[in-house]
UniProtKB/Swiss-Prot annotation:
Tagged with keyword Ribosomal protein: yes
Family in the record: Belongs to the bacterial ribosomal protein bL20 family.
InterPro entries in alphabetical order: Ribosomal_bL20 (IPR005813), RIBOSOMAL_L20_CS (IPR049946), Ribosomal_protein_bL20_C (IPR035566)
GO MF term set: rRNA binding; structural constituent of ribosome
Protein's name according to its UniProt entry: Large ribosomal subunit protein bL20
Cellular component, GO annotation: ribonucleoprotein complex; ribosome
Stored CDD domains: Ribosomal_L20
GO biological process: ribosomal large subunit assembly; translation
Described purpose of this protein according to its UniProt entry: Binds directly to 23S ribosomal RNA and is necessary for the in vitro assembly process of the 50S ribosomal subunit. It is not involved in the protein synthesizing functions of that subunit.
Species, as recorded: Petrotoga mobilis (strain DSM 10674 / SJ95)
Lineage: superkingdom: Bacteria
């Protein structure tokens, strides 16, 4: 008996067309383009997950720098001062403090200033 593959090929094509639903132009309708875009989208999403980590770290550092400069200290001086004082706090938490609890952040800035002054002497 001869085997026909119309059911399997239709299922396969339907899978990619369904995944590409919402894509603009012919990419959402034509099988070959939809399949290419499906794989490309996977690459983009993988790279995006990696870039998101970088972007958030940059955002935290920018926020910390802005809040530290308002207190008369640069970002690198603040981080160095906290390291000298053996304060173990990450940039995400420092950023949250800078945005939501300025008084708490100012305490960390004062700790950094004191440890920097002690290291100079």
């Amino acid at each position: 008996m001869r085997i026909k593959r119309s059911v399997t090929s239709h299922k396969k094509k339907k899978k990619y067309i369904k995944a590409a639903k919402g894509y603009s132009g012919a990419v959402g309708r034509r099988y070959s383009l939809a399949k290419q875009q499906y794989y490309k989208s996977g690459k983009y999403s993988y790279a995006g997950r990696k870039n998101k980590k970088r972007d958030y770290r940059n955002l935290w550092i920018t926020r910390i720098n802005a809040a530290a400069r308002a207190q008369g200290l640069k970002y690198n001086e603040l981080i160095h001062g906290l390291k000298l004082a053996n304060v173990d706090i990450n940039r995400k938490m420092l950023s949250e403090l800078a945005v939501n609890d300025p008084d708490g952040f100012n305490e960390y800035v004062n700790i950094a200033k004191q440890s920097l002054a002690e290291s100079v002497q």
